[in-house]
UniProtKB/Swiss-Prot annotation:
Organism per entry: Gallus gallus (Chicken)
Gene Ontology MF term list: DNA-binding transcription factor activity, RNA polymerase II-specific; protein-folding chaperone binding; RNA polymerase II cis-regulatory region sequence-specific DNA binding
Domain of life: Eukaryota
Listed SMART domains: TBOX
Function according to Swiss-Prot or TrEMBL: Involved in the transcriptional regulation of genes required for mesoderm formation and differentiation. Binds to a palindromic site (called T site) and activates gene transcription when bound to such a site.
Protein name (database record): T-box transcription factor T
DNA-binding region in chain numbering: 49-217
Length: 433
């Protein structure tokens, strides 16, 4: 326990380290000082970069909300009184008496200038401050914004397509205010624009401005997106016609793992097409029709023969193993002319169908030899020849009349049902060549 006398004493705080920090701050830059201000000098930072822009006629963007400058205007100062207070100001003056326009890759005079905007002065946010503060590091005007609207807020209003030159003013404060000096640098002249006109200026801005990297990345992303969209346009994403059925494009030939039960098995492809779960001809199952029955078109629509773009993924029939196809009276071979088999086009002939009767024929080579047969309904649709063998399944869709369930053996097929449908079928006669 301390004595009551000790309790009444205020605790002793050491402030020497605080005073030392303040003294160090005041001394920083003092070595460049001159209390007489006779040796005051202001030098432009990044002079070489400014010269590169000036050679191409520098441009600065002006917007409604204001845009910062690049290159950033920075100056090094020496010769101030370290203990005096100064404010740094920035304004812009017209560099000439012209309005400019960009024609055929160069700036040319484009008429009389517009009336000068009200004088706008930007005060550096560190103002006022000691001379030592201004001399210890370059003074940067990185926060100044250029606008083409008179909206205040410390922004500088400039007229678009006019040439300007920045000026830096140093004013001594804390006593009788007097102008110390004004400095301008011809290499900092620029033309105010709402969008860059010279592509070389744009390239320099992107190259040297660290904040323009986001603009560059966005441009690269857009270019990559355009390339991907262009590549996608070259691939047929719709449905190409094989005979009377619509086969989906390359992106749709891999159906979901559990297709609808009323549809037949999907068209099998080789493992090279990344459809591993649908190995070709697994268990000798026949692959009858492509999955999307809903795309069957019964209207007399003419389809363009674009086999090279739509069917690059289908293997030639030479690489297909023979399929064991059950023989039913519902599968009818369809003969075609010799010109169809030897023609260079995959869909050379159109056969018209009308209601009549047909005579079933045994299925011996219609599916495994040359071109395969098709199932033609009694509809006034024009069908084209199928270029490659496509097999049929024993399961039928409810879309077909008199279809038998998929799980019934061959012996349970009702032949009378097909006889009753005889009037729905038509004989097929290829047109004369």
């Amino acid at each position: 326990m301390g004595s009551p006398e000790d309790a009444g004493k205020a605790p002793a705080y050491r402030v020497d380290h605080l005073l030392s920090a303040v003294e160090s701050e005041l001394q920083a830059g003092s070595e460049k000082g001159d209390p007489t201000e006779r040796e005051l000098r202001v030098a432009l930072e990044d002079g070489e970069l400014w010269l590169r822009f000036k050679e191409l006629t520098n441009e600065m963007i002006v917007t409604k909300n204001g845009r910062r400058m690049f290159p950033v205007l920075k100056v090094s100062v020496s010769g101030l009184d370290p203990n005096a207070m100064y404010s740094f100001l920035l304004d812009f003056v017209a560099a000439d008496g012209h309005r400019w326009k960009y024609v055929n890759g160069e700036w040319v005079p484009g008429g009389k200038p517009e009336p000068q905007a009200p004088s706008c002065v930007y005060i550096h946010p560190d103002s006022p401050n000691f001379g030592a503060h201004w001399m210890k590091a370059p003074v940067s005007f990185s926060k100044v914004k250029l606008t083409n609207k008179l909206n205040g807020g410390g922004q500088i209003m400039l007229n678009s397509l006019h040439k300007y030159e920045p000026r830096i003013h140093i004013v001594r404060v804390g006593g009788p205010q007097r102008m110390i000096t004004s400095h301008s640098f011809p290499e900092t002249q620029f033309t105010a624009v709402t969008a860059y006109q010279n592509e070389e200026i744009t390239a320099l801005k992107i190259k040297y401005n660290p904040f323009a990297k986001a603009f560059l990345d966005a441009k690269e992303r857009n270019d990559h997106k355009d390339m991907m969209e262009e590549a996608g346009d070259n691939q047929q994403s719709g449905y190409s016609q094989l005979g009377s059925w619509l086969i989906p494009g390359a992106g749709a030939l891999c159906p979901p793992a559990n297709p609808h039960s009323q549809f037949g098995a999907p068209l099998s492809l080789s493992p090279a097409h990344s459809c591993e779960r649908y190995s070709p001809l697994r268990n000798h199952r026949s692959a009858p029709y492509p999955n999307p029955y809903t795309h069957r078109n019964n209207s007399p629509t003419a389809y363009t023969d674009n086999s090279s773009a739509c069917l690059p993924m289908l293997q030639s029939h030479d690489n297909w193993s023979s399929l064991g196809v059950p023989t039913h009276t519902t599968m009818l071979p369809m003969s075609h002319s010799t010109g169809t088999a030897t023609s260079s086009s995959q869909y050379p002939n159109l056969w018209s169908v009308s209601n009549s009767t047909i005579t079933p024929a045994p299925q011996s080579s219609g599916m495994s030899n040359g071109l395969s047969s098709q199932f033609l309904r009694g509809s006034p649709v024009h069908y084209t020849a199928l270029p490659h063998p496509v097999t049929a399944t024993t399961s039928t869709s409810p879309l077909y009349d008199g279809g038998a369930p998929a799980d019934l053996p061959d012996s349970q097929y009702d032949a009378s049902a097909h006889t009753r449908l005889a009037s729905m079928w038509t004989p097929i006669t290829p047109p004369s060549m």
